[in-house]
Amino acid sequence: MLHDLINPVNHFCRKTVIKVLEVDIARNCNIVHSRVQGEIQVVTKVFVSAQEVAEKAGVSRSAVSRTFTPGASVAPETRKRVMEAAEALGYHVNHLARGLMRNESGIVCLIVSEMGTPYRSSLIRAVTQHLQNSGKIAMLINTDRSDGSVDRALRQAIRYRADASIILSGLPDKSITQLCLKNGQRLVLINRDDDQPGPLRINLDDQEAAGRILTAFVRAGCRRLAFANSEVGTPSLMAREHGFVAAAAALGMEVAVERFGSTGYEAGKVVAQRLLTRKERPDAIFCANDLLACGVMDAARHQFMMSVPDQLCVAGFDDIEQASWSSYDLTTFAQPVEAIAREAVAFLAAPGVADEEAQVQTLKLHAELVWRGSIRGG
């Protein structure tokens, strides 16, 4: 470690000489170095300031500020001198400091759990890309999905003066939501079941999707229906389960429901084992997401020697990359990831400020059914 190599020559001196053979200290660590007779001279260095640029260019501090402010008036010769000085010194505008003076930081917090799952990672990619395109910077806060961890994450977002937070996991307490709004922070809840006023809720019409997949199963001749879910119990997962059960009940049909573990592949295998060992073995299983569906299909084929879709029809949700693989060829619903990201960022960029007295705002999007080979007659 660096502190193990440094032997201070003077406790009060900002310059320390250390004898090493081949040590390079990168400039981006905010330290510059030079070699002097086989020694490395380490000098602590703060970021280049606008005042330093002004002095080098021979202009005023305000001229530097105007040069780096879009639309501001500055003479061409002055701009040229400032830009040359900035390039020579390695100066970059401190957008954080500038934003705080304008009461905006440009920071948007993404509060999320299970970032490694295919759907969640694709959503993070889309949201961060749209934020960057709009001139915002994303600050990712990883939570454990519990509501308490979401509350802590939002308090952290307030401390960093974030302009907004986009919540992909968990649900904040009403008092925390109001605290965010009172501090001028806008909120977006994605696939969260919450009727608190102020935030924008972006949800899918999960119940409508469940009704469509039920119709597909019935047309394929399926009569013994099942739903495979996890024990996570997120609003979107439960909406799909309840929508499927309700749609079946409307046709006088029952649904065998099994829940286990997380929304992952291994949980799907366990759920399939429970469902397929029942006396009334299902001939159609709607899975809360694609990872569960992949586990269900593999268990059905390898443990129970069943043919998909000839003996068992399976459908999933999310349209992750694996769903299109020939080994699964899974019929599923595609989450409108780009539309979700676009609408979330557009809401944050729209005129107006956060208001704890605002009305409930909900945007419901459509999930596209992607037909593949896991349902007969698709």
PLM-predicted stretches and their roles:
Residues H95, S113-S122, L140-S149, R192, ...:
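Hinge/beta->alpha junction and helix N-cap segments in small-molecule ligand-binding domains
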Residues A86, L131, A247-A248, L276, ...:
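Conserved hydrophobic residues forming the short capping helix/wall of the S-adenosyl-L-methionine
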Residues N10-L21, R35-V36, R278-G378:
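Flexible loop/turn connectors
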Residues L5-E104:
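N-terminal helix-turn-helix DNA-binding module of bacterial transcription factors
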Residues N133-S134, N183, A247-E254, R278-E280, ...:
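Short helix-capping segments at alpha-helix termini
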Residues A54, I167, F286-A288:
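Short beta-strand scaffold positions
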Residues S60, G106, D163, C222-R224, ...:
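Short acidic/polar active-site loop segments enriched in Thr and Asp
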Residues H3-K45, N103-T215, R219, L276-T277:
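Alpha-helical recognition/docking segments in bacterial nutrient-uptake
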